[in-house]
Design a protein with these regions (language model features):
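Predominantly a Rossmann-like dinucleotide-binding segment in NAD(P)-dependent oxidoreductases
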Residues: 11, 129-284, 415
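Beta-loop-alpha module in the N-terminal Rossmann-like domain of NAD(P)-dependent dehydrogenases
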Residues: 51-115
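Rossmann-fold dehydrogenase core element
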Residues: 111-128, 148-155
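Glycine-centered short loops/turns at secondary-structure junctions
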Residues: 93, 120, 145, 307, ...
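C-terminal helical cap and adjacent loop that interface with cofactors, partners, or active-site loops
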Residues: 49, 293-422
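N-terminal Rossmann-like dinucleotide-binding module
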Residues: 1-51
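Short, Asp-centered acidic motifs that coordinate Mg2+ and/or phosphate
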Residues: 33, 72, 152
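Aromatic/hydrophobic pocket-lining residues that form π-stacking "cages" and hydrophobic walls in ligand
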Residues: 42, 85, 112, 138, ...
């Protein structure tokens, strides 16, 4: 059975990640309405998915002012807009797939939870890592009791030097005053993931972090305000916009990459359009002369209600961008997992180590390790059947990770003082 979908916010998530699923699975999903503040993005998506002009809008508010246009709505706008838009969508009768975070406000999170119960609509938050073959396998191992009761988790998120510069120094999520703190916008993914994997409830949180490097005081001698404006430090600067968006082997347009991150700078990325973007737009600014205030490194410790704990570290100073490592220690053994290599090792106390190659368990590892598509398909199935899949990130479950993030930011701003949850 096909589900009709409206998408608000046609950036790298709404337009590039979720919309193409309608073409991959045309029997399951059809896009029937679109909205974005950038008319060019709306026009492009409308052509791609045959959405009539009368169902295309220049804001989420304009779309939501219409009679109900679809079974479900994908909310892929900025962090501080999510709840306002979702509340109206619930009143209209939409089921909701919402980009994380829910909101930078705990009050708004609870307001949305109450509204979802009132209107009896499904809300799923996009904690996509739950849906990857990699973390699904780890969940299976823990649930089967193979390593016993989980006592300690040590986890690292390597954001990557260029990803940090792109998204959290130059990009949309650089300033917590207009979006969210880093521990909410980026690492609520991880808080949700590890609480879910170990089936734990958080009790107390402490956290430390700061903007260590991406600030004016760290600018090298001769640094210009923009990378293309005769910067004397350009040659040896790894954060140089021309390197990241033009010449870098992984991320640069000249190396054949026309997807993320260059597709954030131009709808149809070419060398010419990307050069124009870094000469005139926000992604060409010097990383030491931006208006960013989110942390570039942070450590968060979580004590759970059963006495177990989670130690989590996030860093923007790594060469291997967007990678995660974890060691999960239980009463019978441990799990060591490297998402970059898709390798999981199980070490029981009295047996040889077992190595699991996750690439042999699935074929699609695109989009957050295969999590993006799988999450959307489970959401569509839930709407069609009315049955909630076991791993689905419902609003109720997602709020736990947000409570940890709110506590972590409060602790960080108070020099690491512990903050109670609940």
């Amino acid at each position: 059975m096909k589900t009709t979908v409206a998408i608000v916010g046609l950036g790298s998530r709404g337009r590039v990640t979720y919309a193409p699923i309608a073409k991959q699975y045309p029997d399951l999903m059809e896009i029937t309405a679109l909205a974005d503040i950038n008319p060019a993005c709306v026009e492009e998506a409308a052509k791609e998915y045959n959405v009539p002009k009368e169902r295309c809008f220049t804001s989420a508010e304009e779309l939501l002012a219409q009679p109900k246009l679809a079974d479900a709505i994908f909310i892929c706008t900025q962090d501080q807009d999510h709840v306002r838009e979702a509340l109206v969508a619930l009143e209209k009768g939409y089921h909701i797939l919402m980009e994380k975070p829910i909101s930078p406000s705990a009050e708004d999170c609870n307001k949305l939870l109450e509204a979802s119960r009132k209107y009896d609509r499904k809300i799923v938050v996009c904690h996509v890592l739950r849906y990857t073959p990699f973390f699904s396998k780890i969940k299976e191992i823990i649930s089967e009791g193979i390593i016993g009761d989980v006592v300690t988790i040590q986890a690292i998120e390597n954001v990557g030097y260029w990803h940090q510069a792109h998204s959290f120094v130059r990009g949309n999520w650089r300033n917590s005053n207009t979006t969210s703190p880093m521990c909410l916008q980026k690492t609520c993914h991880d808080f949700d993931l590890y609480l879910w994997l170990a089936d734990k409830t958080p009790k107390r949180v402490s956290s430390m972090g700061d903007t260590y490097f991406f600030k004016e005081a760290c600018a090298p001698e001769g640094a210009a305000l923009r990378c293309m404006d005769g910067c004397k430090a350009k040659e040896n600067c790894p954060f140089d916009a021309e390197k990241i968006y033009i010449t870098n082997k992984r991320t640069g347009i000249a190396q054949g990459n026309t997807e993320w991150p260059v597709d954030v700078l131009a709808i149809h990325p070419t060398e010419e359009s990307i050069y124009e973007a870094i000469k005139t737009g926000p992604y060409g600014r010097c990383v030491f002369h931006c208006d960013n205030n989110v942390v570039d490194h942070q450590i968060t410790n979580i004590e759970n209600t059963d006495g177990s704990n989670i130690s989590f570290s996030m860093s923007g100073f790594t060469s291997d961008g967007a990678s995660r490592y974890c060691k999960i220690m239980g009463t019978k053994g441990d799990i060591t997992a490297d998402m970059t290599k898709n390798i999981i090792e199980i070490g029981l106390f009295v047996q040889p180590r077992e190595v699991i190659d996750v690439t042999k368990l699935a074929t699609d590892f695109s989009g957050h390790g295969g999590g993006d598509v799988r999450m959307v398909l489970e959401f569509l199935e839930m709407i069609t059947t009315g049955k909630e899949p076991q791993g689905i990130t419902s609003l109720e479950q997602s709020i736990n990770s947000h409570l940890v993030a709110f506590a972590a930011e409060e602790s960080r701003l108070n020099h690491g003082a512990p903050v109670e949850i609940g």
